[in-house]
Amino acid sequence: METINQSETIRIKRISQFEYFFGDSGKQGIMHVARALTFDNPSPFAYSRTIRKFDRRRLTFRIGMLRTIEKYASENDVNVVVDDFDHEVPKIEIDDRMSGKFIHQRMAVEAFYKRRFGIIVVPTRGGKTFIAAEILRIFLMTEHEGKFLFITDNVTLFNQAFTDFTNYFSRYGGLDVGFIKEGHCDTSKRVTIAMIQTIQSVLSNRCRDLRKKKDLVSYLRGLKFLCVDEVHDNCSDSKLKIYKMMHGLEYQLCLSATPYRSGQFVQNLKLMEWSGDVIYEISEEVLRKRGVLSEYRVLMLMVDHDSTNCIDTDYSVLLKKLIYESKVRNGVLLRLIEILREMGLKTLLMFHSVEHERIISEMTGIPFISGETSSDERESRKSEFLDARGGMLLASDIFKKGVALPQVEVLINVDGGLEDANTIQKKGRVLGSTDTKNRSMVIDFFDMYRVHFKNHSLKRLNTYVNSVGDDSVDVLDSGNGEWIDDAKNIIRKWFNVGDNYTDMR
C-alpha cells in the first residue's frame, strides 16, 4: 500500500446543497479522503467487501460525510481546509418558551440554521416537534416563498404532529396546513404534513391516477424544506430514494432520539451521508437533571425457562411458547398488573406481538390498541386512559415512538426485543414530566433461555444501565418466592406510596 504523507492538506469545497468537492486537495489529500470514506462491508453476502462513500470520478462526497473526514484528519494529524456555505442564524427573535430548562430547544434551532441540513437528536419528551415548529416559523418569516413538508410514518404521529403544530402556532395567528394521507394529496398550502406510506403509494405502479402522481412528483421536486420525523424508522432504501427526488431542497431537518441503530452499519452510513449527520444533540441525563424529563428506575424480573421442555429450535416457535403463551411468565405479568392496579399507578403495557397483547387483554379485561384499531377509536382509548385516575392500557409497537404520554407512571416492556433503539424509544413513553409527576418506572423481563433470549435480555439491561446507572436498576428473580414483596417495596418506595396504598391514590 502506498504511504500517505501526513503533512498534506485536505481541501474541501461545498459545491451544492448536497455535495462537497475535494479534487483541489492534491494527490496525497485525495488519498486521505479516499481512506477516510472507505469502509469494510460487514455483510458476508455483499457483492463488494468495501463500501466507498465518495465519487471517484467527480471527486465529491455527500454532505453527511464531512464530519467523518474531520474526525479522520484529527486522529491522523492531517490538516483540513473547508470552504463551506456561510449560513447565519436569521435575526428573528426565538420563541420565549425556549428558555430556562428548555434552553436546549433554542440551541437546537440555532444549530440547525447554521448548517440547514442535518439531524437533531433530542430524547423522547425533549420537544423535537416543538423545535421543528419554531424552525418552521422562522422559515416562514424569512423565506417568502417555498414549501415545507413534514413526514411521519403512522396515523398516530400524523395526528399528533398536526395537533402540536396547531397549538404551537396559536399564539402567532394559526397555521394553514395541507395533508397527504390515506390517498388524499393537498399540497396547495405552504405547509404540508404527510404520511410516507401515502407518498409511496401514489408514486408506485399501483396508482392509476397519473395526474395525481405527476402533481406529487412536481411538488416533491420543487420542495424547499423537508423535515422527517423519527428518521431512524424512515430511512430505508425505498424512502431515501423518494427523499433524493427533492432536488430543490435548501433546508433538510431530521428528528430522532436514536438516529443510528446498532448492528445496522450499512444503513447508518446511508442515512449519515444523505442527512448531513448529527448537528445538535443533548442527552437524557441532562434533561432529567433540568426537570424536563422525569427521574426513573428500572425493574427487571428474571424468568428462568431452562426447565421448559421445548424440543423445537425455531426462534418464532420458541417465542410463542416461552413468551406469548408461557403460563409462568404470564403469571408473573398478571401478578405485576395486580400490584400496580392496587397502587393506582397509571400503567402502559407495550407489546411487540399483537397476539400476545390479545391474550393478556382477555385475561385482564384491560383495553388494547394496535395497528388494527381504527384511528378514531385509538385516539379515544388513549384520551380515556390519560384522563383517568390511574388506569391501564395495552399498546402495540404503534406507541413505541413519538406519542406524547407524559402522565404515564409505569411502562411494562412485555415481550422484550433486541434493538437498543427500540428499547430507548419504548422507555421514552414514560419519561415525560408534568406538574404532578416527576418520577417514572420501567419494568422489563430478563428471560433465561438459550443464547438468543439471554443475549436479548442482557442487551436491554445494558441499555438501561447505560441510560440511568447501576444504582437505578433492580433485578429480581421471579423464581424466588419473595419477589412479590420485594417488587412491592421497590415500587412503593419509589413512588412514595403508603402501606395502605389502595386508599392512597
Predicted segments with their positions:
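Post-DEXD/H (motif II) to motif III coupling segment of the RecA-like Helicase ATP-binding lobe
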Residues: 225, 230-297, 464
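Conserved helix-turn-beta segment of the N-terminal RecA-like "Helicase ATP-binding" lobe
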Residues: 148, 155-183
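Walker A/P-loop
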Residues: 115-139
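A conserved SF2-helicase RecA2
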Residues: 276-295, 307-310, 421-424, 432-503
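Conserved pre-motif I regulatory segment
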Residues: 52-53, 75, 81-121
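Conserved helicase ATPase core of P-loop NTP-dependent helicases/translocases
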Residues: 159, 175-188, 348-350, 355-359, ...
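Conserved interdomain hinge at the start of the Helicase C-terminal
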Residues: 310-362
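Conserved RecA-like P-loop NTPase helicase motor core
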Residues: 371-466
